[in-house]
Regions:
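Hydrophobic beta-strand segments within extracellular beta-sandwich modules
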Residues: 23-25, 118-120, 206
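Conserved Ser/Thr-centered positions that define the repeating blades of beta-propeller domains
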Residues: 83-86, 123, 169-173
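Recognizes extended acidic, P/S/T-rich segments that occur
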Residues: 90-106, 167-201, 213-214
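Surface-exposed, short loops/turns at beta-strand junctions within beta-sandwich domains
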Residues: 17-19, 111-116, 194-203
Length: 219
């Protein structure tokens, strides 16, 4: 909130849309007990840059679900244009052209397509930013464990449209460790037999993510 501050000994002022030229700053002390007193002046420039902060690349999105597109930008009410591509930037589809830039987010319904060449772009007044790398849109398989033996584990899952392979992971000491990757065979269900790396562990966590070429979907 803009206003005069005569209480604190550190003050911030802003100049919106400054014109080119020379600026003079006059500093007057308020309730100074004795003087004169030294002071310091620092400044910075805030440009009209737009930074897309999500999705930035590598994410796995699910067709039909809602995702919050997020960005950082100057705080004004001018509209921005949000777009996405599913063919590595050869063509772009407009998501919206009427969202104010100062909302900093937009609730986007992910399109019902399968692609590993997806990016999101935001633009305004000739300034734009887009995802740093491609993201993937593909469904999430339903996974179950048929049986666990001291030496092996049998995992199966429902297949999803457009997947070229499936990555099976198991919880390690801290992270989900990739155990194997199985090529898609076109069936409605698939399975994998993996060696049990922790035969003394009585329970564990498993996940299966669909892959489109080398890109992972959500687990």
């Amino acid at each position: 909130i803009r206003g005069t501050d005569s209480l604190n000994n550190m003050e911030q002022i802003t100049i919106k849309n400054p014109a080119a030229g020379v600026y003079n700053l006059l500093v007057n002390g308020t309730s100074v007990p004795f003087g004169p007193q030294d002071y310091w002046l620092t400044y910075e420039y805030n440009y009209e840059d737009i930074t897309l902060t999500y999705p930035i690349g590598g994410e796995g999105l699910v067709p039909g679900e809602f995702e919050l597109i997020r960005w950082d930008a100057p705080q004004d009410s001018l509209p921005c244009v949000l777009e996405y591509t599913t063919d590595n930037g050869q063509s772009w589809v407009i998501i919206t052209s009427s969202t104010s830039i100062n909302t900093n987010f937009y609730n986007w319904q992910v399109p019902s397509v399968i692609s590993d060449e997806v990016r999101v772009r935001i633009s305004r007044n000739g300034i734009s930013d887009e995802s740093d790398a491609n993201l993937t849109i593909v469904d999430v398989p339903n996974v179950s464990v048929s049986w666990i033996c001291p030496d092996s584990i049998y995992v199966n899952w429902s297949t999803v449209a457009g997947a070229t392979s499936y990555e099976v992971s198991m919880l390690g000491q801290k992270y989900m460790d990739s155990m194997t990757t199985v090529a898609s065979n076109g069936n409605t269900t698939q399975s994998a037999l993996i060696l049990n790396p922790n035969p003394n562990v009585l329970d564990s966590w498993f996940s299966v993510c669909a892959k489109k070429n080398d890109s992972r979907g959500r687990r």
